[in-house]
């Protein structure tokens, strides 16, 4: 977690003048036994149930007033999901709301580490939580920021993921759109 946050912070600080800190009592949120953690198995959780499970875990254990953005680092499952776009600092209104604590990233290879994990996934999903939309142009989403050729090449693109790849992995910066 620390290595990933250090890598992501270098980019967020440079590009967004933003610095993220781990909360002091984060140890109560670290689970090392899948049979006792509050999350669905990867084959179910990575399909979207982790969003609400994380939001509920953060709300009950940390309290909404004690954090601004919550993001689950899974061990395996593949991909990620922000839960919402531009929801940083937004508390859930009900127990079924996806708000500031509903993002997750989980690698397909069981190795939540390195630039592919940190940049292509964590920074990308946190970018959504901070309000960023996709910048690739192989598919127009109607957000007005689809400015990069094909699958794109920056953090909010889908480098290496589409049939229209420009490159295999994201460059470590945000496109200006």
Residue ranges of each PLM-predicted region?
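Extracellular (secreted or membrane-anchored) zinc-dependent metallopeptidases
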Residues: 1-177
């Amino acid at each position: 977690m620390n290595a990933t946050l250090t890598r992501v912070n270098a980019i967020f600080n440079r590009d967004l003048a933003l610095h993220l800190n781990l909360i002091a009592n984060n140890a109560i949120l670290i689970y090392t036994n899948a049979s006792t953690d509050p999350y669905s198995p990867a084959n179910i959780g990575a399909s979207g149930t982790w969003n609400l499970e994380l939001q509920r875990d953060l709300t009950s254990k940390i309290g909404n007033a004690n954090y601004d953005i919550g993001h689950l680092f899974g061990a395996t499952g593949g991909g990620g999901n922000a839960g919402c776009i531009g929801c940083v600092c937004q508390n859930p209104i009900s127990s079924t709301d996806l708000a500031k604590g509903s993002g997750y990233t989980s690698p397909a290879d069981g190795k939540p580490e390195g630039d592919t994990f940190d940049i292509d996934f964590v920074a990308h999903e946190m970018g959504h939580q901070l309000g960023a939309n996709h910048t690739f142009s192989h598919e127009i989403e109607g957000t007005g920021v689809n400015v990069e050729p094909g699958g794109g090449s920056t953090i909010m693109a889908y480098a290496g993921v589409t049939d229209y790849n420009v490159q295999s992995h994201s460059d470590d910066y945000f496109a200006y759109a």
